[in-house]
């Protein structure tokens, strides 16, 4: 099993090679062409090698490019159980919208946010890449099989990967845990700070109590390597103990 990091315009995408197939996690809006180009040019795989495309939550920088990429590859698309279900998310976490607005407002004034979302050079570098497979008639006609991911489920075709429901950043947030290697893909539940040299909590969240519980849940898994939705990858023993 090999996990490849693809740094896209807005977030980290992960392309996982396992048992001769590809699993793709978190494709941002307008970055599907960039990810598909990486699969074809860098990994030398056919688009048909992609069997499953998943997202960790329904923010546009994690779900936005998943559907067009899955269509181009004739793959299955899988999203968390509560994604794209605002009524369910509000019922489960009624304080969520107000907390998310408050934390987003605070983060919006930080220079790193402006650099991420308002950087024209980053736009030119990533968004101009378009793969012809995205426009093929067969991709447009393809009826996309969709799955909903619930806590403790195993990914279709990739049974070594377990879904872990981790509300906090958003109620629909999930992580993906690979049991044989203790590898953990966290989306926005945990981020990797290169400057601090460790994993950190996200600055934007919708429920701090749920966040603490989710981190404790992940700590019990004892991950050896953590692949965050933004920032650097970290490996080692007890890498969540400081959180």
Regions found by a protein language model. Give the residues of each.
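Soluble, non-transmembrane catalytic domains of enzymes that act on hydrophobic metabolites at membranes
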Residues: 49-52, 58-72, 153-154, 160, ...
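Hydrophobic residues at beta-strand termini and immediately following loops
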Residues: 6, 25, 149-150, 166
